[in-house]
């Protein structure tokens, strides 16, 4: 038996990764770790993802004007990544590499169709002319001549396997409506060609294959809504140039009058295949869906509708399906069990439900589905208890049941209730002493509230949302639409708390928060509830008070001094000028910007978004960062007072990011030139300061070393005067 289990979103897709054939991704390949996948888009970027965390680990792009023409793969032996751009240019790099322009490059003599990576073997490079080379042989002479095996044929599909520790490559070509299968063993220099038996009025759409006992089983998905099987033996005694291979019907994709128009499929085991396509019944509109079929019993065993549409691509790694759904890449966990008549009728002995980690995407469920999901999770939790439950534990479990029904009633009642009524019910609900799986329950409730907020603009239980975030029970992945709604309503206080509490906010959302904070006027923010704990201890709130002095210890040089001069009086005067330099933004906006500085990010993913920041906002943000840097430098320990105040490392990192994104624009802006010049002088003075401190430290260490030297063959008489 087979079943589709939990589904979750791995990542969003760009404009080219949408719905429809010809769109989507270039490919999805496994990474060095079983939990890693390599995503290559139809442009110039590839991204490494950790599936269980739903977070990117690295992203690499070729230059503008170049395009990746071959899916990026991982060399399982060296843990290096291999890509081909512009058909002939080979690139090889490692995790720590950032700029692909600086990694290994080789220009080949022929165009590459695909690179296949195999465990415990060198990757195989398949050229568009049908020639094959192992990567090590190819790198010895990148410009070596590649033979043209196929004439006027176009490769449609390819796959590589290891059989008896020998690599085997199989690829399918097409010419004038005829399809051919090539089986090649690169190390044995053997190549066999087969012609697929033609099928009237239909053509193969997709291929997949596997090897077992020296026999290749090639499965072909035809436009006649059928899957055919072709058996090709690896051991061939015949030396014929071309042989015709017969096929046999494996599966008809029809059930109860409905026909599945498949676009792609994968083999799960010897009895199961998964097919992605459109299920159409007579007189009804077709629906795209993911299905699992049992080839042994010719039955449909699992199906999942995909209302947002797909690109027709399907991948399967580690008991997980990967496919595009709308504008996101979706992951669906599945399970397959041994096919038998006993299992089909539920009479298989010792059958147990496998333990699967729960991945619930609360955002995609409606209120009724949320309730069913919540109840199913709680029932699983209760069933997992030992069968030898004590009476006391049974009574405790019994006490939990009313809470479940209470949560369910609440989810069904919030559709029409007012904000005040909903918040009152929530306070009563959360006051319960016991609540099973508290975090999942809260995630379910938050998602239901957000769904109501989307449909009813007047409904917004802000107080409850703030309370739940402050308790630390939520994360961005648990309620991904929460911050989107807060951004739409410009609820800066809620966004501030999310930035401080959520550890997994995507860089796109962090940038959106920064842009909103910079665009809102200080006058508006003065009427807004914002937590000022991160700024109240150091910011200059009274701009008219010119006598404000901060408790600092001077550690900076006069920025106006010459390189070889040092005037203490000038230093003090300059320091007095710096100490009364006022913050370029109000305290409320400063507190919000501090929350952005505290959020976790990856420079690779944040920098493209920062480049879209308007120039005036970028200058204002840079002025504030400069102000913070000056304030930090005034302190002997270079730390700002207050709770959740930004560190000097965070300030410097953001300054570098902002300058990387906008340096050319800022150099051209008149209002930014003075700021850049001031920053340059200040940083130069700091560098000179630390240079002098390093010299002093070196001198002290040398004095300490001389003082500690012992002369074993000498003696001295010391006279000590006691006072």
Swiss-Prot record:
Keywords: Activator, Nucleus, Ribosome biogenesis, rRNA processing, Transcription, Transcription regulation. The keyword Magnesium does not apply. GO terms for biological process: maturation of SSU-rRNA; positive regulation of transcription of nucleolar large rRNA by RNA polymerase I. InterPro entries: NOL11 (IPR042859), Nol11_C (IPR048897), NOL11_N (IPR012584). The keyword Transcription regulation applies. It comes from the Eukaryota. It holds the Pfam family NOL11_N. It is found in: Nucleus, Nucleolus. GO terms for cellular component: nucleolus. Ribosome biogenesis factor. May be required for both optimal rDNA transcription and pre-rRNA processing. This is Nucleolar protein 11. It comes from Gallus gallus. The gene is NOL11.
